[in-house]
UniProtKB/Swiss-Prot annotation:
<feature type="binding site">
    <location>
        <position position="520"/>
    </location>
    <ligand>
        <name>FAD</name>
    </ligand>
</feature>
<comment type="similarity">
    <text>Belongs to the oxygen-dependent FAD-linked oxidoreductase family.</text>
</comment>
<dbReference type="Pfam" id="PF01565">
    <property type="entry name" value="FAD_binding_4"/>
</dbReference>
<feature type="domain" description="FAD-binding PCMH-type">
    <location>
        <begin position="60"/>
        <end position="249"/>
    </location>
</feature>
<feature type="binding site">
    <location>
        <position position="239"/>
    </location>
    <ligand>
        <name>FAD</name>
    </ligand>
</feature>
<dbReference type="InterPro" id="IPR015345">
    <property type="entry name" value="Cytokinin_DH_FAD/cytokin-bd"/>
</dbReference>
<feature type="binding site">
    <location>
        <position position="104"/>
    </location>
    <ligand>
        <name>FAD</name>
    </ligand>
</feature>
<feature type="binding site">
    <location>
        <position position="482"/>
    </location>
    <ligand>
        <name>FAD</name>
    </ligand>
</feature>
<feature type="binding site">
    <location>
        <position position="173"/>
    </location>
    <ligand>
        <name>FAD</name>
    </ligand>
</feature>
<feature type="signal peptide">
    <location>
        <begin position="1"/>
        <end position="26"/>
    </location>
</feature>
<keyword id="KW-0560">Oxidoreductase</keyword>
<feature type="glycosylation site" description="N-linked (GlcNAc...) asparagine">
    <location>
        <position position="411"/>
    </location>
</feature>
<dbReference type="Pfam" id="PF09265">
    <property type="entry name" value="Cytokin-bind"/>
</dbReference>
<dbReference type="GO" id="GO:0008131">
    <property type="term" value="F:primary methylamine oxidase activity"/>
</dbReference>
<feature type="glycosylation site" description="N-linked (GlcNAc...) asparagine">
    <location>
        <position position="124"/>
    </location>
</feature>
<feature type="binding site">
    <location>
        <position position="110"/>
    </location>
    <ligand>
        <name>FAD</name>
    </ligand>
</feature>
<keyword id="KW-0964">Secreted</keyword>
Amino acid sequence: MTNTLCLSLITLITLFISLTPTLIKSDEGIDVFLPISLNLTVLTDPFSISAASHDFGNITDENPGAVLCPSSTTEVARLLRFANGGFSYNKGSTSPASTFKVAARGQGHSLRGQASAPGGVVVNMTCLAMAAKPAAVVISADGTYADVAAGTMWVDVLKAAVDRGVSPVTWTDYLYLSVGGTLSNAGIGGQTFRHGPQISNVHELDVITGKGEMMTCSPKLNPELFYGVLGGLGQFGIITRARIALDHAPTRVKWSRILYSDFSAFKRDQERLISMTNDLGVDFLEGQLMMSNGFVDTSFFPLSDQTRVASLVNDHRIIYVLEVAKYYDRTTLPIIDQVIDTLSRTLGFAPGFMFVQDVPYFDFLNRVRNEEDKLRSLGLWEVPHPWLNIFVPGSRIQDFHDGVINGLLLNQTSTSGVTLFYPTNRNKWNNRMSTMTPDEDVFYVIGLLQSAGGSQNWQELENLNDKVIQFCENSGIKIKEYLMHYTRKEDWVKHFGPKWDDFLRKKIMFDPKRLLSPGQDIFN
């Protein structure tokens, strides 16, 4: 009898909650109710709210009023249409409701609350991916593309594709990011020099605009929305499906890390390699810095060589690591040794410091996962990450190196995290898309991927970032920030430069009430 009574009470409480309108906040701080008639799967429990309030950056904490866990794209569209001009249902009122903010959230890997919606509604895109029919990843019959739910992680796209012997051609270093999240920024990594960023490898999108309109777009169908959304920081619509280009998947990878003590040789070899388009060229290229005032990670190298690698870093204070990979399978096996031999003979690295591993294709692409596991075990993953990612014009990279790397980083008492340093080709980017790059044929991707672990204050690392930006400003180095977070309109206008007027026009066209992605702080 007691158990029956308890079950009845739980049923009644659940029914009561489901029949209670959800209270959120409008732009003006006014209470707005989401009416039951919208039939939305809305979560307001403390765990859901807390999970949506912070991100990988672990610097901001902005509570939404509610989290939408949609089972269909029509739920998202209903939410946005209501936000544009529904009714408040507050004390029987039938006057138009005040607008409220809406943000799509994938894996929450933003750095400064870009996927937050303070007081508004965060749309959990993972829910949408889990409900996708017939599946979150559908490979075409001919294997040339995949239709992917935007909340799907790239690692799941990879798994589904390689099962069919195909693969996307360009990747981020970390695969546990949502497809919609990277396409809203650019999606860059070691294949970008050859295939462009991930946004350059999309055939078609399904998007729900800020007005709640469900639209399919491509270079020929609704092209303004297509090009605007790709790299558009979530300002024009929520991507719900992406058609991703696929190619033949290799099975194995020759993965090399090659050490340089001379920056000029490092720079020369990197730029030569990204210019090679024949079969002897590499499929992946990145660069990293190993500095004596930071943690020197020697885990990639054979145990017998780790001591001399560490000694090389200590002797020179800084070592430049060229990281390249060449893919192969049974059909291309004969050329692999030729490529490795050419690299060993023609590159200007420190003699005896070229190291090669032979690994499965999946393991190579998923390589950062092992680093994540290590950091999690040490309690150093869920810490503040005041990262700085910038694109530096190739013509000024020597000045940047001398002023920032030698002048700032090497003079720090200690450095934390990874420093990325590698060039890419601008002609692999589509200028019609919203993403901004320096106006030069070759520009460098610089990533100061710092972590504030232990007693370190993230503000100290942020101050270093500010010094880097200030040095570039004072030196006339026209950088473009990536994954940036500006809080002043003039900074956004400067960032977009000649694209600003078009960006603003598209905002008015697709999200006139400025509801979407308020955490970017572009139109707030």
